[in-house]
Amino acid sequence: MISTNQFRNGSAIRVDGKRFTILSFQHVKPGKGHAFVRTRLRNMDTGAVIERTFRAGEKVESIRTDSRPMSFLYRDGDLYYFMDQETYEQVAIPEDVVGEAKDFITPNGEVSVLYADGEVVSVQPPAHVELEVVETDPGVRGDTATGGSKPATLETGLVVQVPLFVSVGDRVRVDTRTREYQTRV
């Protein structure tokens, strides 16, 4: 059990029998009345984000989480197979648990797999990944005066907006949090 004054961003807690990750929290002490803590929580199972208010000093159950580095091996149907880099154990993770991370996973690519209560909760890619452009329109000189962009399909199927000078076969760095083009590599 942890008190609301021990909340930290990224902490895992159990509220009403459901597992949540704390996205943000704010201690509020109004002029009248008792202090409280306003939080934004992400449900670990569904991904839904809710707002919840706790009384200051209220205790909630904490969840032990473990993050392990793993390498992506291959995909078979709707299962993604990863190898634990420490024990070399293979783990099959369903596509719905992998979620949006599938757009950034390449063979032998490293990810962080989050376990809560001994089961896989999420797959988190690194902050930036380098992917190859497999399809994009050719950029024509003089198309725009202020620099434009065009859609490009990357090797994982993700479509991002890239500058006109990027062509098929180029490798680009993409920010996995914003899903935006960063630079050509």
Swiss-Prot record:
Pathway: Protein biosynthesis; polypeptide chain elongation
BP GO terms, sorted: peptide biosynthetic process
Subcellular location(s) of the protein: Cytoplasm
Predominant location: cytoplasm
Source domain of life: Bacteria
Xref: InterPro entries: Elong-fact-P_C (IPR015365), NA-bd_OB-fold (IPR012340), Rib_uL2_dom2 (IPR014722), Transl_elong_fac_P/YeiP (IPR020599), Transl_elong_KOW-like (IPR013185), Transl_elong_P/YeiP_cen (IPR001059), Transl_elong_P/YeiP_CS (IPR013852), Transl_elongation_fac_P (IPR011768)
GO molecular function: translation elongation factor activity
Short name of one Pfam family: EFP
Record key words, sorted: Cytoplasm, Elongation factor, Protein biosynthesis
Tagged with keyword Cytoplasm: yes
GO cellular component: cytoplasm
Cystine pairings recorded for this chain: none
Entries under NCBIfam families matching the protein: efp, PRK00529.1
Family assignment from sequence similarity: Belongs to the elongation factor P family.
Chain's role: Involved in peptide bond synthesis. Stimulates efficient translation and peptide-bond synthesis on native or reconstituted 70S ribosomes in vitro. Probably functions indirectly by altering the affinity of the ribosome for aminoacyl-tRNA, thus increasing their reactivity as acceptors for peptidyl transferase.
Entries under HAMAP family matching the protein: EF_P
Protein name in the entry: Elongation factor P
Protein's organism: Rubrobacter xylanophilus (strain DSM 9941 / JCM 11954 / NBRC 16129 / PRD-1)
Taxonomic lineage of the native organism: Bacteria, Bacillati, Actinomycetota, Rubrobacteria, Rubrobacterales
Encoding gene per record: efp
